[in-house]
Design a protein with these regions (language model features):
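Canonical Rossmann dinucleotide-binding motif of NAD(H)/NADP(H)-dependent dehydrogenases/reductases
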Residues: 2-33
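Conserved mid-core segment of classical short-chain dehydrogenase/reductases
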Residues: 71, 75, 94-109, 128, ...
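Catalytic Tyr-X3-Lys loop
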Residues: 85, 101-121, 140, 157, ...
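Short C-terminal tail/terminal secondary-structure segment
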Residues: 97, 229, 240-253
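Active-site helix of classical SDR
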Residues: 123, 160, 168
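Alpha-helical segment proximal to the catalytic Tyr-Lys
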Residues: 128, 173-177, 237
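Residue(s) in the substrate-gating loop at a strand-loop-helix junction
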Residues: 144
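A glycine/serine/threonine-rich, flexible loop-to-helix segment
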Residues: 177, 189-212
Length: 253
């Protein structure tokens, strides 16, 4: 298995895409360290995964937008696992949907904080950890195909994810000499709990959206996870600085 004896840290791992990434890595033999702000859901996920997998699964609830909080969580993980071989920064959120001109400064700050700064904070500490310890590694940041196509009525989120793409490629250029790879996975609409809740209220919106996806269905979190797992593995050793869309073909519809 491609992740046998490897330790991987995943943020935003309590549910949705982050949980799917954890499952995909576990399927390939990884030990995983799961971080999320939602302690209750995180603990439930850990219990579920431990019932399904035999490898080492640990978790810690923390505020991922705060560098001190994340650094503390990171080094608690180092104390337990000794070393990390890969990181996936999956945690993100958007504060509201609406016309561009209706967003307040508070909406802007909250969305940028939860969709861009959260990646910047974690990436900075991960790179520092790898470089300080003279380690190689692979990092995958989760973006969105809205960063490429734009996203009507969620413009701040789309712009924040475009910033994630550019940050990732910029950092990839800086750290490649240390044999640290940084890539981006850009999901389309994935069947997460939040998406399910929205479409339960707006079933016609789901039907309309699915028509714009070449495969005519929403994605599953494990499908994002499988791509991330590959990028975190040595099988992707010559892939660096790339933005990989996993969206059922919606970005070329």
């Amino acid at each position: 298995m491609e992740h046998s004896q490897r330790n991987i840290l995943i943020t935003g791992a309590a549910q949705g895409i982050g949980k799917g990434i954890a499952q995909a890595c576990l399927d390939q033999g990884a030990n995983v360290y799961l971080l999320d702000i939602n302690e209750e859901v995180l603990n439930a996920t850990v219990s579920e995964l431990r019932s399904l997998y035999k490898t080492n699964i640990e978790a810690f609830a923390c505020e991922l937008t705060d560098d001190k909080s994340f650094k503390n969580a990171l080094y608690k993980g180092v104390d337990h696992f000794s070393v990390f071989h890969g990181f996936c920064n999956s945690a993100a959120s958007s504060q509201g949907i609406g016309p561009f001109e209706t967003f307040s400064d508070k909406d802007f700050d909250a969305t940028v904080n939860l969709s861009f700064k959260i990646v910047w904070t974690c990436l900075k500490e991960e790179i520092t950890y790898l470089r300080d310890n003279k380690l190689t590694g692979s990092i995958v940041n989760i973006s969105s195909n809205s960063a490429i196509r734009g996203y009507a009525f969620n413009s701040i989120y789309a712009a924040s994810k475009a910033a994630v793409n550019n940050l990732s490629q910029s950092v990839a250029k800086e750290v490649a000499r240390d044999q640290i790879r940084v890539n981006v996975v850009s999901p389309g609409t994935i069947n997460t709990p939040g998406v399910e809740a929205y479409f339960a209220k707006e079933p016609s919106a789901k039907e309309k959206l699915e028509k714009t996806i070449l495969l005519k269905r929403l994605g599953d979190p494990i499908e994002i996870g499988n791509t991330v797992s590959f990028l975190l593995s040595d099988r992707s050793s010559y892939i660096n600085g790339q933005i990989i869309s996993v969206d059922g073909g919606s970005s070329i519809y």
